Amino acid sequence: MEKKKFYMTPAIAYASGKPHIGNTYEIVLADSIARYKRFQGYDVFFQTGTDEHGQKIELKAEDARITPKEFVDNASSEIKRIWDLMDTSYDKFIRTTDEDHEKQVQKIF
C-alpha cells in the first residue's frame, strides 16, 4: 500500500541577515508537523530555504562592500547552519538563486 503524501513548506527566510525569532518559531512549528506526519506514516517532503532577491539585499550588500551574491551566500549559509544546528528534518533546502529554481520560475512566467 502506497503511503499518503504530505508536503510541508514554511515561508522561506529572507536572506537580508541572520534569522530572527519569527523565522525560528516558524521552522520549529513546520518541523514539528513534518515529524508528526512521518510518525503517522505519511511520506513527507519538507522543503525550506531562503529568498535571495530584492532591493534590501542590494542595499545591505552595498553597505557591507560586497556583491549581492556574496551577501546572500553568507546569509543563506548562516540560516542553513542554524536550521541544521536545531536538527531540523527538512528534505530540501532551496535558494531562490539556485539555477534550477530560476529555470522553473522562468517556465511559469
PLM region descriptions:
Residues M1-F109:
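N-terminal, positively charged nucleic-acid-binding surface of large information/translation enzymes
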